Amino acid sequence: MSQENVEIVRSIYEAFNRRDWDAAFRDQHPDVELTTPPGGPRSGTYRGRLECQRYVQEWLTPFEASTVEPEELFESGDQVAVVLKVQARPKDSSAEIEIRIGQLWAFRDGKALSLRIFPEPEKALEAAGLSE
């Protein structure tokens, strides 16, 4: 159940790194919701696989290369909280950007139903009812 959800989240990140959108969205509910933190350039809630995929692809536009690496995954019922390392290199630059964010996935019937993104990893853990 929850361990299966953890493995689904891992496979989504692996597919993201390959830019394999079919695989990345295969285990997501057709009505999946992606909620980004307030204050960002495209903050808000995106609904449905296509809208979520469009958001992700637009987010990637300024970068020549980018990868995500789940450093820690915590299962809590039908949720998976993630401490995620994001590495990116902007186009026309040799600068490397590395940040850590939090993500909270919610599942229903083996499908990712929602993803909430947090600028601070500990906020995702708090939202899941977990503490470090």
What are these regions (language model features)?
Residues M1-E132:
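C-terminal and inter-domain tail/linker signature
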